[in-house]
Amino acid sequence: MMPGIFTGRVQIKYRYGRYGYTRGGGKIWHGGMDIVGLDSTDIRMPHYKNKRITGTVTRARRVTDHSNKTWEWGWYVCVKLDASQTPDDVNFLYFCHCRELKVQPGDRVASGDLLAVMGQSGNAAGGYDHCHLEARATANGKGLDPSQYAGCPNAVGVYGEQQKTNDDPTKMQLITVGPVSRGDADAVYTLCRSRGLVDAGLYKSEWSVG
């Protein structure tokens, strides 16, 4: 599988999450792909058919005015692609329904860069965390097929391989740090706690006097 917007496995969970899906007698048309990151919630700038691409963040916001159709996207990021990188008509990529944004308008981004965190803000159908990925030729144009950027086909299923980690419990390393200041010690403790080392009893700290 080509690199997409998530690291590891991804899923198209429902039929209505596919690009081009219609319902309501053809009155409602889905202009993007609803992609779930199974191994990571971090939304990243994708590749195009394994090719690295670059662009500029033009919008990173949430619209609350319901007269503006984009309120349905919730928190979203728009990236304008640099010119002449791909042979298709896509110039803008939208990453929608985010829980948290990691970029600001004006930021330069490239394939693999962190853009946002997957969520279900706005009018996210189904009540599950995902990213609505939309591709457009113009900022206000109709959605184009985003599958070459998605990292998976435009079909229901699970795609990709689970990312391997270096967390081999048979290979443990003893690390001694210090002496350090109280601020540095607190930072080390916070990191160890986030990695689960404190709860596992693998973190030890001693204060010296004098």
Predicted regions and their residues:
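Zn2+-dependent peptidoglycan hydrolase active-site motif and core
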Residues: 46-102, 124-132
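Acidic, glycine-rich catalytic/binding loops that coordinate metals and/or anionic ligands
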Residues: 1-4, 104-113, 130-171
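Short glycine/threonine/proline-enriched tight-turn/helix- or strand-capping micro-motif at secondary-structure
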Residues: 11-49
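Solvent-exposed beta-strand motifs enriched in subsets of small alpha/beta binding domains
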Residues: 98, 166-210
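Residue "hotspots" at secondary-structure boundaries inside conserved domains
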Residues: 41-43, 101, 107
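Active-site-proximal beta-strands of protease catalytic cores
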Residues: 54-58, 105-122
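Soluble non-cytosolic domains of exported or imported proteins
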Residues: 37-40, 89, 179-183
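Polar, enzyme-active/binding microenvironments
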Residues: 5, 9, 13-15, 53, ...
